[in-house]
Amino acid sequence: MIASLDELYHSELFFLPAMDKNARLVGLEIIATFATEDGAVRMPTELVAPRLSVEEQYCLFVEKLALLETCQHFFIQHKLIAWLNLPPAISGLLLLDSELFSRAARFPFLELAINENYPGLNHGKENETLAHLAMHFPLMLANFGAGEASTKAIFDGLFKRIMLDKNFIQQRADMISFEPFMHAIVAQISSSCESLMIAGIDNEAMFARAAPLGFSALQGGLWPPVPVSQLIRLVQR
């Protein structure tokens, strides 16, 4: 996809791994970076997304679905989960556009990730768009603890999976109370979703601390994103 910002950027898609406590692959999030045509400048989606038009966001979502289609047998064969971020501007279109809905619904291993800044998230199941999405697709809250939402949507049971925000984790990682605090979160939230995940695992020391805490999967700089050509390496032991 080509995005028109201060100059033209093209999207490049990668797979960000999530591992279990034994460092075995559980799932992959499809993420995008944006590069200038000469490759001299690269930016992550977080910096580019606020400047994308609805049409560009739609094209990027479709591009991710198309990539997922090319490697769906890998996900099925290895029983992996795929996560795609669902921008608020696309969530309504997904429910209204039958072709887009069908393309996303064909993948039984796909879960849609939304962030805490999703409009009306604090209304929980009273948010009709969010409630309808949860009826048709497994949802993951991608950055719980970012401080932009209450827990109502979680306790309303709208999310199959919840990922703790990487900044939330890294701000607390050096505290003596880190482990007890994580245990408290797991105890409070685990009954409202199928599994809890943790981001911000950037080194072996952090992995050693987080692995025993009861999270189903861990994500972070310890397992960097890979292109589609390197997927097979993630399941080779």
Curated annotation (Swiss-Prot):
One of the entry's Gene Ontology molecular-function terms is: cyclic-guanylate-specific phosphodiesterase activity
Keyword Transcription regulation set for record: yes
What keywords were assigned to this record?
Repressor, Transcription, Transcription regulation, Virulence
**Gene3D superfamilies in UniProt:** EAL domain
Q: Which InterPro entries match?
A: Cyclic-di-GMP_PDE-like (IPR050706), EAL_dom (IPR001633), EAL_sf (IPR035919)
Q: Which domain of life is it from?
A: Bacteria
What is the protein's known function?
Acts as an anti-FlhC(2)FlhD(4) factor by binding to FlhD, decreasing its ability to bind DNA, and thus negatively regulates expression of flagellar class II operons, decreasing motility in nutrient-poor medium. Required for resistance to host phagocyte oxidase.
Q: Which family does it belong to?
A: Belongs to the YdiV family.
Subunit relationships = Interacts with FlhD in the FlhC(2)FlhD(4) heterohexamer, inhibiting its ability to activate transcription.
Q: What is the name listed in the Swiss-Prot or TrEMBL entry for this protein? A: Anti-FlhC(2)FlhD(4) factor YdiV
Gene symbol here is: ydiV
